Amino acid sequence: MKTVTVSSAVTIKDGKIFITQRGYGDYKDKWEFPGGKLEKGESPEDCIVREIKEELDADIRIIKYLSAIEYSYPTFHLIMHNFVCELKSSYMSLLEHEAAKFVDVNELDSIDFLPADKLVLEDIKKAIESHL
């Protein structure tokens, strides 16, 4: 089975977490933490900065490395590096997603996330409880 390595941004603003809704593929309409695949020779940190610029036309600053999770989808194995980030600019544009919103940490369990993204929820809750 093929392994795909990605990075995701857990962007927190005023105690709320930024999530995006997929507009394509088998998991269309599911929610996720924005990010994408590492390019050859690229670090997970460089990947997340690039992906957020490509997907949202926004600049971010990485605050800290949150976690890495692994999940096996039917056709590939995913390794996802998760970073706590903050927006450096107030402007964002949805270039690849159907929708986006900031949600309260208490809402996370009720959102229809992609299977791999669900595995990050406990790490996010712990990070917020410890004030990052």
PLM feature segments, named:
Residues V84, S93-I124:
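NUDIX/MutT-family hydrolases
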Residues D26-K30:
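A conserved beta-turn-beta hairpin within the catalytic core of GNAT-like acetyltransferases
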